[in-house]
């Protein structure tokens, strides 16, 4: 079965990692390409048409056809989807200037209960979750490839200066909620390699793209992540070699 991997811009590091593993270790060829950036997740981007899931976002739809030569997601393909756990929209919301998760017990801040926080996460992920529900309902059984750990914010350039413990707690709880939601639907998630996180749970500089990019992992990170993806897939879905697209 062919392994196709697509998703948001975090897929770029995965593509570099897949290419390195093919060249250096003889891994079976895969088709790995990003569809677009994570800001596209804030609006509906998929629908069911004629019993198949299609992408309604114009950029996503164009990339799917260009790089995967398909117009819809079908059960005969094995899909790894890199969507979810890009939690920057959540923990960079200005509402956290006056509020804090209730489980942290921060004095002087309006407590956000666990139930309310779960609703915040569900609202942020609503279109991603709708996409996965659509895939399942049409017989496609995807797995999820998580976004990397968050990059430690630069205090000189970050506008919303939250305590690091609070920022990381928000991210961690959001990841747990997403994993639980996926688990209830029988969807596996491949999480970032533990060795890529520092002692506070942020992406180590050695694995971050760096420069003016505050979000993404680098090619070294992508290589480690793709090795973990292939280890996961070796247990559940034998791969069928395909011609790599230019």
Regions found by a protein language model. Name each.
Residues 1-77, 232-233, 238-246:
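Basic, amphipathic N-terminal segments that precede the first structured/catalytic domain
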Residues 12-15, 41-43, 87-92, 150-156, ...:
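Short catalytic/ligand-binding loop motif for oxyanion handling, primarily in non-cytosolic enzymes
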Residues 57-67, 114-132, 164-178, 222:
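Well-ordered, non-membrane alpha-helical segments in soluble/globular domains
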Residues 67-118:
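Oxyanion-hole/transition-state-stabilizing segment in secreted/luminal serine hydrolases
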Residues 129-168:
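Active-site segments of SGNH/GDSL-like serine hydrolases
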Residues 144-148, 184-203, 207, 240-244:
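Acidic carboxylate-rich catalytic motifs and surrounding loops in phosphoryl-/glycosyl-chemistry enzymes
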Residues 152-191:
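Substrate-gating cap/lid alpha-helix
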Residues 206-246:
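Histidine-centered active-site loop/cap adjacent to the catalytic His
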């Amino acid at each position: 079965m062919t392994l196709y991997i697509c998703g948001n811009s975090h897929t770029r590091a995965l593509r570099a990692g897949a290419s390195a593993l093919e060249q250096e270790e003889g891994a079976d060829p895969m088709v790995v390409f990003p569809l677009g950036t994570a800001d596209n997740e804030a609006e509906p981007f998929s629908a069911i048409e004629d019993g198949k899931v299609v992408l309604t976002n114009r950029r996503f739809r164009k990339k799917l056809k260009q790089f995967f030569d398909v117009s819809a997601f079908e059960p005969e393909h094995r899909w790894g989807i890199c969507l979810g756990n890009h939690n920057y929209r959540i923990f960079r919301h200005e509402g956290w200037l006056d509020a804090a998760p209730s489980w942290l017990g921060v004095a002087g801040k309006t407590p956000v209960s666990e139930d309310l926080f779960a609703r915040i996460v569900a609202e942020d992920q609503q279109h991603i979750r709708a996409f996965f529900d659509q895939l399942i309902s049409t017989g496609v059984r995807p797995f999820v490839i998580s976004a990397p750990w968050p990059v430690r914010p630069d205090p000189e350039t970050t506008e919303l200066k939250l305590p690091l413990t609070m920022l990381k707690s928000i991210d961690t709880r959001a990841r747990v909620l997403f994993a639980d939601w996926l688990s209830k639907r029988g969807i596996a998630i491949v999480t970032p390699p533990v060795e890529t996180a520092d002692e506070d749970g942020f992406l180590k500089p050695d694995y971050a793209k760096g420069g003016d990019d505050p979000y993404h992992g680098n090619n070294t990170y992508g290589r480690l992540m793709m090795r973990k993806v292939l280890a996961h897939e070796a247990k559940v879905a034998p791969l069928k070699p395909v011609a790599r697209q230019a």
